[in-house]
Amino acid sequence: CSHDFCEHFGPIDVLVSGAAGNFPAPLTGMSANGFKAVMDIDLLGTFHVMRSTHAFLAKPGSTVINISAPQAFQPMEMQAHVCAAKAGVDMLTRVLAMEWGRDGVRVNSIVPGPIADTEGMARLAPTREIQRAVTESVPLGRQGVKEDIAAAAMFLASPEASYITGVILPVDGGWSLGGVASLGNALKSVTSS
């Protein structure tokens, strides 16, 4: 946020940070640059956005929403780089919820599950067979839609969530309860063939 922007529009009430980099690869087949690229995009990108905007957040009353991933808390084969980066994003969320809470700033994360018609699904579930397997592994029996994530963000930004901070909120149809592993297995079979 530039000083001129905030001077014109006023303090930031809601900040959503959603940088994501991803590609399937086993750790032994990944370069240090590949690993670093995902860390730079996901974790360092979130750090830079949050650090550079803190001075421009409305205090008290603003909210920060980071977009995480199931790989932050659920190990997934072929995703060591994303697991490490998004776990860092979730811990950064919790730490800043404590630090910035004193200023009246709330910080939470949303963890999207499989969301239809997104770049992430196209990259991680590139075939109909994998898409079907992922959908079948979601307890609610469907992939989410972008509006599911938007609704969660709107809730976290609303006055109804004014006493919620430091929360890592899965919006995944129950996928994080066990279905995540199926994608790792599918990725392994695709990259080995």
Regions found by a protein language model. Give the residues of each.
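Short, small/polar-rich loop/turn modules that mediate ligand/substrate recognition or access, typified
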Residues: V16, G101, R106, I164-G166
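Substrate-binding pocket helix/loop in short-chain dehydrogenase/reductase
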Residues: P26-L27, G34-K36, I130, V134
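Short, well-ordered secondary-structure patches that form non-catalytic structural/interaction elements
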Residues: M30-K36, D40, V190
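C-terminal substrate-recognition "lid" of short-chain dehydrogenase/reductases
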Residues: F47-M50, R142-V171, S176
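Active-site helix of classical SDR
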Residues: M50, A85, T93
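Alpha-helical segment proximal to the catalytic Tyr-Lys
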Residues: A55, M98-R102, S162
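Short C-terminal tail/terminal secondary-structure segment
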Residues: Q74, M154, T165-S193
